Amino acid sequence: MFKLTVKPAGTSRRAAVGTIWALRALVLATGLVAPLQARAQATAGGDPPPSLWTRDTLSGEWGGLRGALGLDFWATGFYQDVFKGTGEDDGDLCGRVDLMINGDTGKFGLWQGGGLHAHVTYRGGDLPGFRGGALLPVHTSGVLPLDGKDEVVAASLYYSQRFGDARLMLGKINALDLPARHPFFGGWGTDRFWNVAFVAPPSGVLPPVIMGGILTYSFAPYSLTAMVFDPNDQTNSYSFNRLFADGVNVSLSLARSGEFAGRKSGAAITATYSTAEGTDWSQIGLPPGSQTTTKEGSYNVAVDISHLLVESARVPGKGLGLYVKAAIADGNPNPVKRSFVGGVAGHAIVPGQPLDYFGVGYFFFNFSDELQNAVAPVGRFNDEQGIEAYYAFVPTPWLRLTANLQWVNPANGANPSVWLGGLRVRVAF
C-alpha cells in the first residue's frame, strides 16, 4: 500500500513555521493590494470587480499575479470524533495549508505549451489518520504527505509540455494531484471524502508521490496514458540518486469519455506492473523463528465507470452521478487482492444552493490471503469495508463547510465496527 520513508535531516519545525508565516504575510499583503489594483482595472475596463462574496478566492486575483502563476492557496481545518467503537474519546483538531503553482511558460514570454508545477503542503495538529483499528486511513490529510507532520513538503515538482494532442509530465508528482478534478474520487482529503479509500483507492503499486514520467495522448473520444515511475514513495526525495535502483513500475490506461442515454459518461481500464521486490506474505517471520523472504513482481488491474444519472439544469455536465472503481491484484507481494469502491456524488443540483455538493460511497478491500493466513496465529486480520457520506455547504466560492460521517468495519478483527463524525472548514485565499 503506502510505503514509509525516512525524513531527511535538516528540515526543522522552525523552518516550517517560518515558511507558513511568510505565506500568511504574502496572503495578507496581496489581499490588501489586490482590491486596489482590481478597482483600477475596473475603472479602465468598465467592468466592476467581483464582490467579496462572489469572487472565487478571499484575496482576489492579486493584481493578475494569481493568473500569471496559476496559483492556488488554501487552508483547511479538521475536527473528527469517534462516536462508537475502539478509541472512543474526545475529538481532535488539525490543520493543513496547501500551495499549488501551475505556471504557463507562454505567459512568461517563453515557449508555448510548457508548464512548471509545484504542490507544497504543511500540516499540523493532533488528529490521527488511523482510528478504530482501521487499516486504511479514515483521515487522509492526517497521513499524507507521508511523514510530513509539522513539515513543509514539496509533494509535486515537475515540468509538463504539450505537443498537439499529447502531454508529457516529468519529475516528482503527487499522485493525489492526478484525480483533483474528479467529481467523486480525489480531493486530497481537504475536499469531498476523508477516507483514503475514496480519496486515492490503494492499489499496492502506486506510491503517494512518484518520480518519473506520464505521457497522455488524446484522440477523441479516447485517451491513452502511459506512466513509468520508481516503485518507492518519493515524498522526501529531491534528487535522482537512487531512481529505479529497486525496479520500475509501468502503467497503461485507456479511457473513453462521451455520452450514454444522452448524459455524460466515461469508462477506463488501467493496468500497472511493478518489477520491485516486495515482502512474500507467506513468509513474514511469523511465528517467531521463521524467516521473512521477498518476492519479485506485482500487478493491479482496475476498471472505472462513471455515468451522470441526473443532469443539473444550471450547469451542463454536472449533476447527480454514479461512480465505480473495481480492481484485482496478485495478492502477494501486493497486500491487496481485490477492491471495490463506488457511490454517488451530486454537484449543482441542491435547490437554492447552487454551489453545494455531496457524496455517499461504499468501499470493500479484500487483502492478501497469504498475509491473512500468516497473521492468523497471532491475531485476526480481516478484509475491510466502510461507508462514508459528506455534505459541503458553500455560502461563497472561497468558503466550504463540510459535515462528514463514516462507518468502518476494520481489518483488525479484535476491533468492533467504528462510527466517526467530522467537520471541515476550507478557505481559498
For each predicted feature, which ranges?
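Short loop/turn motifs that connect adjacent beta-strands in outer-membrane beta-barrel proteins
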Residues: 53-71, 102-116, 165, 221, ...
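Surface-exposed coil loops of outer-membrane beta-barrel proteins
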Residues: 130-158, 165-253, 372, 379-380
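N-terminal periplasmic/intermembrane-space "pro-region" immediately following the signal or transit peptide
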Residues: 2-6, 30-32, 36-82, 88, ...
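Signature for the C-terminal beta-barrel architecture of outer-membrane proteins
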Residues: 164-165, 196-312, 316-330, 346
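Outer-membrane beta-barrel "beta-signal"
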Residues: 417-429
